[in-house]
């Protein structure tokens, strides 16, 4: 049975009190039903920076949840107002960090080169970067998906140790839209990514993943997990995601 990595990306959601309520509810759910989580499932949450302190070492150990960051700065330290370094994240027990999310690429003009620099900074500080790639609706409809993905992969993963990273395929047209690539389409692109990288690379799919479609997506040979947005904001739906393959 292959290992699966399921990460919830909260984006800019939840106040401190709301995040604390989620954690309390998740801890209770884990105490009652944690045994339903298969040993092949690794899972985590990427909260906002203001809520990361709630995911303390005791919680991480008690519930086996991983702390994930939504972004980092590529520099180690210095005069970079408002930024967070990989070293800082490592010091609070973060394990993964998302880099190159399409919202960062589009809204903050992050290039493949910047994504590559951030991934290198993560690896150098003992974090595992989850490097996002994906095409726009216009590129998808024009049949340019593979060309776009290939360029992103080549430049974003340049000189990286592929055994120390995760790649998340997130078609931009499926993020937060309710639209989802069919499992077959997602598999086709993830298989393509594997063909131009490594057979052992961990590849996630992201884009409107929900409890209703995760099982079919995770059945695909070249999909090794999910990067989840909205469905990770509620304890019930997140718990459904990480127990989708529990014995019925």
Swiss-Prot record:
Q: Do the record's keywords include Cytoplasm?
A: yes
Q: Which molecular-function annotation in GO is an example for this chain?
A: triose-phosphate isomerase activity
Q: What Pfam family does this protein match (any one)?
A: TIM
The record's catalysed reaction(s) read: D-glyceraldehyde 3-phosphate = dihydroxyacetone phosphate
Superkingdom of origin:
Bacteria
Chief location bin:
cytoplasm
* Example GO biological process: gluconeogenesis
What does the record give as its pathway?
Carbohydrate biosynthesis; gluconeogenesis; Carbohydrate degradation; glycolysis; D-glyceraldehyde 3-phosphate from glycerone phosphate: step 1/1
Q: Which residues are annotated as active site?
A: 101, 170
- SUPFAM superfamilies, sorted: Triosephosphate isomerase (TIM)
Q: Where does substrate bind?
A: 9-11, 176, 208, 229-230
Q: Which PROSITE patterns match?
A: TIM_1, TIM_2
Question: What's in the keyword line of the UniProt record?
Answer: Cytoplasm, Gluconeogenesis, Glycolysis, Isomerase
Q: How does it assemble?
A: Homodimer.
Entry similarity comment:
Belongs to the triosephosphate isomerase family.
Name by which UniProt lists this protein: Triosephosphate isomerase
Q: What is the primary gene name for this protein?
A: tpiA
